Design a protein with these regions (language model features):
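Catalytic cores of alpha/beta
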Residues: 110-119, 175-186, 234-248
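Hydrophobic, well-structured mid-protein blocks that either form specific transmembrane helices
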Residues: 123-171
């Protein structure tokens, strides 16, 4: 009986993954463009330009924000304290700001997360594109999935009241396969818009980030119920294009790696 249940579950995952890839390929066919034919700007639209390092000076943050806007990145992912600094450089562009919430640990109280999210979506409605929050991966490791779901849902409900999409970071390098798969369903149940692999700031574990295996695992679990963002260790053009081939929706890429994945000569 157990073997049959495992077979059925594996088959469902495979079907969900195949359906997702089929839909993506149909969309590619509609535009009659392969990734190799896509312009730099079209490829940049997959990118959340990560400007999160705590040692960045305000001047560096402004320069990197301007760079991301010029390239046409989907968002500039920044720490909340720099929203006012970056806001003038976003207005009138296709690029939006994506602040992080309770980053990078996800260990604050639910009330604290909701309060931070509310400040951001109320104060920056004209420039905020999405909000990235960190799931409490210590509780995930402990198997406290109901608490994890409730925590995520509180922030998601707050953001959705103002039509702001939410991405949920798992920190997959700290989790095993079962934990990753179950957390995908926590996010679906909470109404999240994206599942996301990594913060890029985890210590004490080997850094693998958005591997093909992890992204496929997430895609299998969420199907068409949620989008998938890969983040962490996307540093080569080959990896970047491979994830696009897999049907990924978004990628978080650091400032040093953006020129590499976009094949820019600087």
């Amino acid at each position: 009986m157990f073997i049959n249940e495992q077979f059925v579950l594996a088959n469902k995952r495979k079907c969900a993954y195949n359906a997702r890839i089929r839909t993506k390929k149909e969309n590619y066919n509609e535009t009659s463009k392969q990734k190799s034919e896509m312009s730099t700007r079209e490829l940049a639209a997959y990118i959340d330009y990560s400007v999160l390092k705590p040692e960045f000076t305000p001047e560096q943050i402004v320069e990197l924000t301007k760079d991301g806007v010029e390239l046409g990145c989907a968002t500039i992912c920044i720490n909340p304290g720099y929203m006012d600094l970056c806001k003038p450089y976003i207005k009138g562009s296709e690029t939006k700001l994506c602040p992080v919430c309770d980053f990078p640990f996800g260990t604050s109280s639910t009330e604290s997360k909701v309060a931070q999210a509310k400040i951001l979506i109320d104060g920056y409605a004209d420039v905020i594109g999405e909000l990235d929050i960190v799931a409490n991966f210590g509780k995930i490791r402990a198997g406290l999935y109901e608490e994890v779901t409730a925590d995520i849902k509180a922030v998601v409900d707050t953001c959705h009241a103002k039509n702001v999409p939410v991405k949920v970071i798992f920190e997959t390098d700290a989790l095993n396969e079962e934990q990753i798969r179950k957390t995908c369903h926590c996010c679906i149940d909470a109404g999240a818009d994206f599942v996301k692999s990594s913060t890029g700031f985890l210590t004490g574990f080997e850094a693998h980030g958005a591997t093909v295996e992890v992204i496929k695992m997430m895609q299998e679990e969420v199907g068409d119920k949620c989008k998938v963002k890969g983040s962490g260790c996307i540093r080569t053009r080959e990896h970047f294009l491979e994830l696009i081939d897999m049907g990924i929706d978004r990628m978080g890429v650091g400032y040093r790696s953006v020129p590499v994945v976009l094949d820019l000569q600087r």
